[in-house]
Regions:
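Terminal amphipathic alpha-helical/low-complexity segments used for targeting or macromolecular assembly
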Residues: 100-400
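Glycine-rich hexapeptide-repeat left-handed beta-helix
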Residues: 2-177
Length: 400
């Protein structure tokens, strides 16, 4: 029944039994039980619980909520189950779904059935706010930090799942037909509109990640020829290919984790200091390894051979990236607007008229356009558009 907690966890009032609590696993409520599961960057709503006992062979089951997954009040999951990264769980789920390849989803229960809404959390203002707040809430003071935490929302770890998720959704559409009202996946149901939106959301996020990586790689260099661009795009290392994993906050290529495990098993790595040094090296080289992975995905996603890529191809990718970034930011902006709707003002202006309610709301919450999060989103649109335009200007004169 012992549990393992990593940095910046908060286990106030609630109950934890046999859990692996990665960084920022947070529960604040007396009625909350976290049991026999792996969690990280997780916020448990009041009354959330899980069962690891199906009254047959004892409490032998377990489950995983991947990084950033969170639960609403009174949610319930019957283990074994696996919830994809940055997903939201609402209601009671008893069908043992594995949604690890459909990250950023909603799992909503309707009449004892799990309905899955893939990718929708990508446009949620709550997801963006979470990603911004975690680094600010890191309370560690010691410069020698024992937990290596990568806060990136989009990384090879989540984008690899989106590639798989996109393929899964396209295959469901092909097999069951484009006109099906409901699709079945992993004992969950997906509505037709949700499936099509899911494909679109994942493609937007992939455009955003790969575009970001390319812009970063080509930053600050004046290129004269296409060959110079190709040479710069070539990765610095082979490390980073293949699958990536989240190791309690550290995002790293699985090949490097396997190499460390092999070293521990054969005795060449036999000190805690050496293990920590390996984790430190992976963390420090994250962006080098990330580029290796992204470079090889350019061909898969854009159908371009990096050996023959041209400045015009890069400009096409950057324009798609600009559309993705601005499109996603606009969705987040619209989602934030809901927090300033009339229905959100209902609890304000205790005894007053409609106008006093609105006035009280504005005194407490401010108005929409001057909200710090909203102004940050608008600034982000401006900055990213300028960043893309700068690269286009730098390479558009290169001859084919």
């Amino acid at each position: 029944s012992d549990s393992l907690f990593f940095s910046n966890c908060q286990g106030e009032n609630g109950e934890a039994c046999a859990i692996f609590a990665g960084p920022f696993t947070v529960t604040h409520h007396k009625s909350t039980l976290l049991i026999a599961g792996m969690f990280s960057f997780m916020n448990a709503g009041s009354g959330s619980n899980q069962s690891n006992h199906m009254y047959k062979l004892g409490p032998i089951h377990q489950g995983t909520m991947e990084r950033g997954a969170k639960t609403t009040s009174d949610s319930y999951i019957l283990w074994p189950a696996r919830v994809g990264a940055f997903s939201l769980v609402m209601g009671r789920h008893v069908n043992h779904a594995d949604t690890s390849n459909l990250p950023f989803s909603y799992l909503i229960e309707q009449r004892n059935t799990t309905y899955l809404v893939p990718g929708v959390n990508l446009r949620s203002v709550g997801t963006i706010r979470d990603a911004q707040k975690w680094p600010k809430r890191d309370k560690r003071k010691d410069p020698n930090r024992l937990d290596y935490i990568n806060y990136n929302l989009l990384s090879p770890y989540t984008i690899q799942k989106m590639f798989k998720g996109r393929s899964i959704l396209k295959e469901l559409k092909r097999v069951s037909g484009e006109t099906s009202e409901i699709y079945s996946y992993q004992s969950a149901k997906i509505k037709n509109s949700s499936l099509n939106n899911g494909i679109r959301f994942y493609e937007i996020a992939i455009h955003k990640f790969l575009g970001n990586s390319i812009i970063k790689r080509l930053e600050g260099i004046n290129f004269q020829t296409n060959e110079e661009i190709r040479q710069r795009l070539k990765p610095d290392t082979e490390i980073g290919l293949g699958e990536w994993v989240d190791v309690s906050g550290l995002i790293a290529p699985k090949s490097e984790i396997d190499r460390l495990l092999d070293g521990i098993e054969n005795g060449t790595v036999n000190r805690l200091k050496s293990i920590n040094a390996s984790f430190a090296e992976m963390h420090e080289n994250y962006y080098t390894y990330e580029w290796t992975w992204a470079y090889h995905k350019i061909q898969e996603f854009y159908g371009l051979n990096p050996e023959t890529i041209t400045a015009q191809d890069i400009i096409g990718i950057v324009k798609a990236w600009q559309q993705a970034v601005v499109g996603l930011d606009k969705m987040v902006y619209e989602d934030a607007k809901k927090e300033f709707s009339l229905s959100s003002m209902t609890g304000f202006g205790a005894d007053g008229s409609h106008d006093e309610m609105k006035l009280d709301f504005e005194q407490v919450r401010g108005d929409f356009e001057s909200n710090t999060f909203v102004t940050a989103v608008l600034k982000h649109i401006e900055d990213k558009t300028a960043l893309g335009n700068e690269l286009i200007k730098r390479i558009e004169a290169i001859e084919l």
